[in-house]
């Protein structure tokens, strides 16, 4: 019996800090079928009884196996609640010799979306760096549940105490490789009644596509800069994928976070 969820996370970040959707929302159907096929082959080859946890990565429709563990994972409680099935109990009984076919494994929450979100302690440690990495930083998990994916995601953010503004000034700072996607994002924010501002390159790129976006200085460009505006509580939403390897870029990124 297979249950597949989709993690939303960058590479080189601990999987325990991920957001997670069940069922997957952006993986192509033929890739899901291939993942199911590969997982069955792995389970049979390894002769696993009970849980088997497999982590896959997908890039350009190519599937990569990251790791295979013959054990449960931290997503079992989330998946059990999402499917309304006692998966840990079933797996334990299978390990003890009972047949999997004995159990009714049909989901009791059909046509529902479940979103798991990680909870971070950054509010209690104001000087800590928000940047995620290989070391797990989250201290808990919450879950959003709804017939609509967007609403399920919103519920998960509210439960994790992540504010969801509905209007105001949105600040955008994007890597060059993200700017094309950022135009569509900017259009959606404007439709939601947000005003836009951004660092020089991002603001110029968005403005070139007919969307009004006010330019704000980076920290290294002098006051008034983005941190001044943030400290003045004038920003409702921050979307930042910027960064870089130079000392100035790293310093700006740390100051913004």
Residue ranges and their predicted role:
Residues 28-32, 175, 192-193, 246:
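A generic secondary-structure micro-motif detector
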């Amino acid at each position: 019996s297979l249950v597949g969820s989709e993690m939303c996370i960058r590479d080189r970040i601990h999987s325990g800090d991920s957001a997670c959707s069940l069922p997957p929302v952006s993986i192509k159907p033929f890739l899901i079928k291939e993942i199911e096929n590969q997982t069955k082959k792995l389970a049979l080859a390894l002769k696993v009884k009970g849980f088997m946890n497999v982590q896959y990565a997908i890039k350009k429709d190519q599937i990569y196996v990251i790791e295979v563990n013959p054990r449960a994972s931290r997503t079992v409680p989330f998946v059990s609640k999402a499917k309304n099935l006692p998966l840990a109990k079933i797996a334990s009984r299978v390990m003890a010799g009972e047949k999997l076919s004995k159990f009714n494994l049909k989901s009791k929450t059909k046509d529902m979306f479940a979103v798991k979100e990680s909870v971070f302690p950054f509010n209690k440690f104001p000087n800590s760096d928000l940047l995620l990495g290989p070391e797990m930083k989250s201290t808990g998990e919450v879950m959003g549940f709804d017939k609509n994916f967007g609403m399920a995601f919103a519920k998960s953010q509210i439960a994790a105490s992540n504010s969801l503004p509905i209007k105001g000034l949105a600040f955008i700072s994007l890597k060059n490789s993200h700017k094309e996607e950022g135009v569509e994002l900017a259009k959606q924010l404007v439709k939601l009644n947000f005003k836009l501002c951004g660092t020089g390159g991002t603001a110029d790129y968005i403005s070139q596509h007919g969307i009004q976006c006010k330019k704000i200085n980076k920290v290294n460009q002098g006051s008034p800069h983005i941190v001044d505006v943030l400290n003045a509580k004038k920003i409702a939403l921050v979307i930042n994928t910027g960064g870089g390897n130079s000392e100035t870029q790293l310093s700006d990124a740390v100051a913004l976070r």
